[in-house]
A protein has these predicted regions:
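Amphipathic alpha-helical protein-interaction segments enriched in hydrophobic
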Residues: 32-39
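Acidic, Ser/Thr/Gly/Pro-rich intrinsically disordered interaction regions
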Residues: 1-32, 53-112
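Extended, well-ordered alpha-helical segments in internal regulatory regions
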Residues: 39-52, 100
């Protein structure tokens, strides 16, 4: 039986599974899986039939931050302390995996 991904709650279950995998493996592929799932959460919430209007509003605001709209830009100094900068970082990493560019705005992740 395949798991179903019908709404954002199912996506949260998927993220929980991926986080456990990451904690066990400490693997870059598992990290990327987590980031890709995190990247899609605001859109899933925004389009959900079960999410409250308040949650949808928050998701829309976070999605705009992630996309760099309204002049929001990533400040690496705030990355560990500010959720908005963390979300922007997630979006940049995910877009870089889909659309390889030489942009200086795309973070470089190196495995150690």
């Amino acid at each position: 039986m395949l798991p179903k991904l019908n709404d954002y709650n199912d996506l949260l279950v998927k993220l929980d599974y991926e986080m456990k995998q990451l904690n066990e493996s400490d693997n870059i592929y598992d990290l990327l899986n987590c980031l890709l799932t995190l990247n899609s959460l605001p859109e899933w919430i925004k389009n959900s039939k079960t999410a409250s209007e308040e949650l949808k509003k928050i998701a829309l605001e976070k999605e705009k931050i992630m996309k760099g709209e309204n002049g929001f830009s990533l400040d690496e100094k705030l990355l560990f302390d500010d959720i908005n900068h963390q979300l922007r970082f997630v979006r940049l990493v995910c877009n870089h995996t889909k659309h390889k560019t030489d942009s200086k705005q795309i973070p470089i992740i190196e495995s150690i």
